From Swiss-Prot:
Cofactor comment text: Binds 1 zinc ion per subunit.
Encoding gene (name): malaS
Organism from which the protein derives: Dictyostelium discoideum
Lineage per the UniProt record: Eukaryota, Amoebozoa, Evosea, Eumycetozoa, Dictyostelia
Protein name, UniProt field: Alanine--tRNA ligase, mitochondrial
Binding positions (Zn(2+)): 610, 614, 713, 717
InterPro entries according to UniProt: aa-tRNA-synth_II/BPL/LPL, Ala-tRNA-lgiase_IIc, Ala-tRNA-ligase_IIc_anticod-bd, Ala-tRNA-synth_IIc_core, Ala-tRNA-synth_IIc_N, Ala-tRNA_ligase, Ala_tRNA_ligase_euk/bac, Thr/Ala-tRNA-synth_IIc_edit
PROSITE patterns the record matches: AA_TRNA_LIGASE_II_ALA
Keyword tRNA-binding set for record: yes
Amino acid sequence: MIRSSIKNKITTTKSLSCISLINRQYGTSTKEVRETFLNYFEKNGHKRLPSGSLLPYNDNSLLFTNAGMVQFKNQFTGNEESKYKKVTTSQKCVRAGGKHNDLDNVGYTARHHTFFEMLGNFSFGGYNHFKRDSIQHAWDLLTKEYGLPKERLAISVLEGDEESAEIWRNQIGLPNDKIMYKGREDNFWSMGDGPGPCGPCSEIFWDHGKEVDGERYLEIWNLVFMQYNKSGKEGDEMPVDKLPIPCVDTGMGLERMASVLQGKFTNYDIDLFQNLINSFKEIVTMDVGRAQFQLQQDPQRVETAYRVIADHLRSISFLISDGVIPFNIGRGYVLRKIIRRALSYGKILGFNGPFLSTLFPLLEREMGDIYPQLIERSNEIRNVILNEEGTFYNAIQRGIPYLEEFVQQNKLNEESLFLLYNTYGLPLEMSQVKAKQNNIEIDMDKVNKLIDETREQSRLTWNTSSSSSDQTTQQTTQLPEKTFLSWKSDNIKPKFIGYNGCVENDNSKVLRSHFDNDSHLVYLSLDETPFYGTSGGQVGDVGELINVSSGKNVYRVINTIKPYEGGLVLVVEWDPSQQLASQVYQDLKQDSLLNCRVDRSIRNQVAVHHSATHLLHAALRNVIGKSVVQAGSLVGSESLRFDFTHGQKLTPNQIEQIEQWVNDAIAKDIALNTDEIPYEQASKNSDTLQLFSEKYSELVRVVSIPGFSKELCGGTHVERSSSIHQFKIISESSVAAGTRRIEAVAGLAATNFFKNHYQLVHQLSNSINSPIVNFQQSFERLVNTNSKQEKEIFDLKLKIAQLSSVNYNGQYKSDNGGEMIPLSLHIIDCEDKKAFTKVTENFAKEFSSSPIQLTISKGGKVLCQLLSSSSSSSSSLSADTVLKQLFKSIGMGKGGGNKLMANASIQPLNNEILNSILNWSNVNNNYNNKKN
């Protein structure tokens, strides 16, 4: 029996030498490994379920799904009952960012990935004996289905878990020298540091054999026996309670298992990765210049680059397909970081421009049959990648001159690295390499701290700016989270009865109530209610409650929320000037009977905007293409907001087509259909739109407008399309790279929109003394007249500026060896920005023989601009540097720019300031001896 930690023995090997353990090229393909696993458990009574989204549903504790059990978290905790007692899945996982972050290791180790698939089987009380059955299943699959030699397998158990050890020894027949004991750090699993299900685990290892140099054992499967509930805090020695029903959670890395079955020592040598990498190599070597460049690089560095790009292309594509868009915070920031890391490694292969988007079809070909959303969202994925590539290379082009300047001035430090990253978007890796090349030490912890502080501030600002809500649902008080957790634990799940136009219900019973006297709010859960809770982008209902017994006190429902899955809570406001707290308590306490009255007019307008949102979504996909994916929405009574993936601003013609498409559907007076069908059935219909970031129940509601739209939706809608009346887009804008936003109005809100605009046009017509029918012609005449007058004024300003100009020939003394460079100095009397810019352009042409052109206005608000000719005798000459030298000499100035142009301001000119400028410019003649 082995009772040592063997921490150094049982690890993922770091060696890159490939030893053929099973003498075949690939043998079992990765697809066959996946299918064999799922099919085995299906044959043994498990329900095969699709992979969950990479975006954990309603779980802010995780950036991304990083394990197979994430989508079953509520079943493990007991907060949700599973329809199936035994389940098997192949789960998409991403580990990049947050606690589980493999990003920096990817490409350098044998098995680290940002994206991988986790094969798993799960039992929620479905096994006769949870340990015995799960161990037997694992052994049979490995030795009989996969055909692995028994003598090449070893296992570990938790020290003290003799029950598991006995099963391996007596039931499976594993010899003692193959059973290894490990501590809680390695063989006890929990969902986190806080309360939750947990238990010992048994890991299964593939033995590479003693002849392998370096580490010997590779973990291929982890069997977790969740039999306890941890109710203590972090640091507790042992769990305190047994779960009423022990569960099983197992995880096997697909790529890792494929490497064993294919006799490969690293995951990157399996068929899936080699197919991608070899295709990449063909593309790279098609360009002679790139091929020659690659031959000059370190071969190991080149191979690492191929691995990084192959891995990152997978995580990038799957994240985008699940709705993540590159952004500056949160999940979008991680995606952006992965894309930029891949592009940085592309430079090693000779790529100096976008290339990732052209590689995506290779992944689509390799994995599209298993994950059809790669095919369905192909255009969107490629467009998002291409847009981000453009952003990246623009950032490099913008930031490199500043990086070079910081190096030349010995100012490359933590603050300047942060500035280059935060202001100009230059990747940290590029600045780090430059620092290393110049023997400059950088404290990256300090840089990362600056980034984290800025990101947190951005997150707070973003949360504030993106949390706009309908006026009927504004909630400014702190919600009683502990109360809601208690209600959730007590399984308080009200029944919603508000479909089919139902807005009233008598004798609803109060199941739970929470009184907040400070805010004069009461939170109620009723047994059944017509009030719809905020979800799916739709705002919650408002209305009134009346106590059945008293029949007189009316309470205003200001919001309806869903604080937990299955929960439905009415937020009720009471007026202390009109109602006594004791009476409120008596009327709304537990077991009270209430008459519910939803505000019908607001409900109807919300329904109008929700149905209009479905038509808008369909119209976008019809006009722009199937690559459009919903990225967010807000449906209120006054308007709707719809965010969608698209890399370009919509043209006026596209907006007009979208509006016309929606209004045509409205005019056809189509009856809406709602059906409840199994999710499995709905998900197989490619015409039915769904959000991959949403978690759907076994039974889903399908809302369809025949011939136009079909979506999974739990919201309220109109009965016929004609009830929407009319639809109008009021704005289209960008909310992030690759994400656009449309704001629109429908129904009564659209009528009011047109009414208000008519009144505005009427007022404007009166102000220019024109009949409203002739307003357009009158307005155009007014605009034309104004344009002519503005041009005349501009020409006069330009003429005055040119006539007043005082021009000097001077010299600039550079820092580089004191070289004297010709300089033209121009003093003008011009405060108009447009005229000032035009004058400087004229000077640049007229005095082109001088590499440096310096123009300064002298009156009022001062503008200073520096133009630097590209024909300069000094390649290191920078307009920004020249300007800063001027500031230093005259003791004032604020501004900056780049190598070719810089803008600034100083104090209004007087003789003293002017003479200081002339002295710095090495001009011999003074102000009175000007040279025109």
